[in-house]
């Protein structure tokens, strides 16, 4: 078979496979070059007798993620709802508090005002940021030069609000608040639909999973493309100096095409040599954007014992000593293979990597026993984990984050073509970037950029809106009148201060009128 094709796709994750499928469906010849011995990229479904199947990488889908839902349905996949029937748990200062809804409730009135102001402020700031061009926000540079830690120090007045906000950042982007740009993080949350949508299970980003695992999306596209998908072919050189693009792999194979789609995380572009060299901004961008740190952990039990205690399996866990910050029930929809999924996030992933797998499991079980107040948590029947930080062809998970100052300086070139190279990957999406949904959007957009380049579609068809999924409809995210209008803590203090001044002035005036002042 000839190594010549119309398009070479570098990277066989969901983004690259979605791009390849669209081009293949349009009659173009495509070759996918994947470095690993499997497709799927940052999605990874393993199968064995202890788990049946389990997603060790990207897994969750939900309402408003219409592209991945449409593609998966076309490939014959179905979703099921992540269990949230029973109560959730918020574990803080050594105690467990049951709750329902997306956010743990707050009983202290000052903390309540502070929490309410935090979520409201982040959403309001997000509204100022264009999803497709965050560097065009009115205060882009001011916000980009600030870390999320600095922003939270400005917004939050109470320690408990700052702690839950820090957990929120850690969970959303697997990085520390001092590591990420405020502009980038606020954009990230905004393009996922806001603070409530991104964090929620029901009606949110974690509502559903695929029966059989998310790895099937890439695997089924591979079945369609057949031997056009080449595994264990790390790309080491892309040469655009001739009429066609020449792509060389680590095992000394040479492929030739009219166009290339790079569907790998931006930082992995550092593993490839380019002729001619990349333009300055692209060349520097790829050395400045790391990926987050996370170990995904699945603890299996004989049965979902937490449900008997009226807990759904979702735990929001605060505290430096806790290895896991967030869990979800990962039991199969028929109740078999009972499991709790937990994330070891950011600096904790870097700290706990020093332990053995068995030591990490013990720490997790001891934590779950404490939070759930159950000795059954100490009796796991199986354990799976995946440390994405050690994956040389990912560099981390879930996604690339932008440190302060990078987005405004380099963001414009994120998906800007370089000659005949077009860029996909979830990082280049404008909606649910960082998720499987963003991967599909980016892959299909890059494919349509090539269709436009060869004259098959007009430019205004490169970006296409996606109809809402009929199977997974989205309910609007609403807020109450009080949530919208309650003052912040400093607002309340100002109000008290003003009230005090007005009261004192009024009393003084009355006293003066009635001659109550003592005259010296």
Swiss-Prot record:
Its EC number is 1.4.3.21, 1.4.3.4. GO terms for cellular component: mitochondrial inner membrane; mitochondrial outer membrane; mitochondrion. It is a single-pass type IV membrane protein. The chain crosses the membrane at residues 490-516. It catalyses: a secondary aliphatic amine + O2 + H2O = a primary amine + an aldehyde + H2O2; (R)-adrenaline + O2 + H2O = (R)-3,4-dihydroxymandelaldehyde + methylamine + H2O2; a primary methyl amine + O2 + H2O = an aldehyde + H2O2 + NH4(+); benzylamine + O2 + H2O = benzaldehyde + H2O2 + NH4(+). The modification N-acetylserine is found at residue 2. The record marks 156, 365, 382 as: Important for catalytic activity. InterPro entries: Amino_oxidase, FAD/NAD-bd_sf, Flavin_amine_oxidase, Flavin_MAO. Keywords: Acetylation, FAD, Flavoprotein, Membrane, Mitochondrion, Mitochondrion outer membrane, Oxidoreductase, Transmembrane, Transmembrane helix. The modification N6-acetyllysine is found at residues 52, 248. Its cofactor is FAD. GO terms for molecular function: monoamine oxidase activity; primary methylamine oxidase activity. It is an enzyme of class 1 (oxidoreductase). The modification S-8alpha-FAD cysteine is found at residue 397. It comes from the Eukaryota. Belongs to the flavin monoamine oxidase family. Monomer, homo- or heterodimer (containing two subunits of similar size). Each subunit contains a covalently bound flavin. Enzymatically active as monomer. This is Amine oxidase [flavin-containing] B. The gene is Maob.
């Amino acid at each position: 078979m000839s190594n010549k094709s119309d398009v070479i796709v570098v990277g066989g994750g969901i983004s690259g496979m979605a791009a390849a499928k669209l081009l293949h469906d349009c009659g173009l010849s495509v070759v996918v070059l994947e470095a690993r011995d499997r497709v799927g990229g940052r999605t990874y479904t393993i199968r064995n007798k202890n788990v049946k199947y389990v997603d060790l990488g990207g897994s969750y889908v939900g309402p408003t993620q219409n592209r991945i839902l449409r593609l998966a349905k076309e490939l014959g996949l179905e979703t099921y709802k992540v269990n949230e029937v029973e109560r959730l748990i918020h574990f803080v200062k050594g105690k467990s508090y049951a709750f329902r809804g997306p956010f743990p409730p707050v009983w202290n009135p000052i903390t309540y005002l502070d929490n309410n102001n935090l979520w409201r402020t982040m959403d309001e700031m997000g509204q100022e940021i264009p999803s497709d061009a965050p560097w065009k926000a009115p205060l882009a540079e001011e916000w980009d030069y600030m870390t999320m830690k600095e922003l939270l120090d400005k917004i939050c007045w109470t320690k408990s609000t700052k702690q839950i906000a820090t957990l929120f950042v850690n969970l959303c982007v697997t990085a520390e608040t001092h590591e990420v740009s405020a502009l980038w993080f606020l954009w990230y949350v905004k393009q996922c639909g806001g603070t409530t949508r991104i964090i929620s299970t029901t009606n949110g980003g974690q509502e559903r999973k695929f029966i059989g695992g998310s790895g099937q999306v890439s695997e089924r596209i591979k079945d369609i493309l057949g031997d056009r998908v080449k595994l264990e072919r790390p790309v080491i050189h892309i040469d655009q100096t001739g009429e066609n693009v020449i792509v060389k792999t680590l095992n000394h194979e040479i492929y030739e095409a009219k166009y290339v789609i790079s569907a790998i995380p931006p930082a992995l572009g550092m593993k490839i040599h380019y002729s001619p060299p990349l333009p300055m901004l692209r060349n520097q961008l790829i050395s400045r954007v790391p990926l987050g740190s996370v170990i995904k952990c699945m603890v299996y039990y004989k049965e979902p014992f937490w449900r008997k205690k009226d807990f759904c399996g979702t735990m929001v866990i605060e505290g430096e000593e806790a290895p896991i910050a967030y869990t979800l029930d990962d039991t199969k929809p028929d109740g078999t293979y009972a499991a709790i999924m937990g994330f070891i996030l950011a600096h904790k992933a870097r700290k706990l990597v020093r332990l053995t797998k068995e030591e990490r499991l013990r720490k997790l079980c001891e934590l779950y026993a404490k939070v759930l107040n159950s000795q059954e948590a100490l009796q796991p029947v199986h354990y799976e984990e995946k440390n994405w930080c050690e994956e040389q062809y990912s560099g981390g998970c879930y996604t690339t984050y932008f440190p302060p100052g990078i987005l405004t300086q380099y963001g414009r070139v994120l998906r800007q073509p370089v000659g005949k190279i077009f860029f996909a990957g979830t990082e280049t999406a404008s909606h649910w970037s960082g998720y499987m949904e963003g991967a599909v959007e980016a892959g299909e957009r890059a494919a349509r950029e090539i269709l436009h380049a060869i004259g098959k579609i007009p430019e205004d068809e490169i970006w296409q809106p996606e109809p809402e999924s009929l199977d997974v409809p989205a309910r609007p995210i609403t807020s109450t009148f009080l949530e919208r209008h309650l003052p912040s803590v400093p607002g309340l203090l100002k109000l008290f201060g003003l009230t005090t001044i007005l009261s004192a002035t009024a009393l003084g005036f009355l006293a003066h009128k009635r001659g109550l002042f003592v005259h010296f």
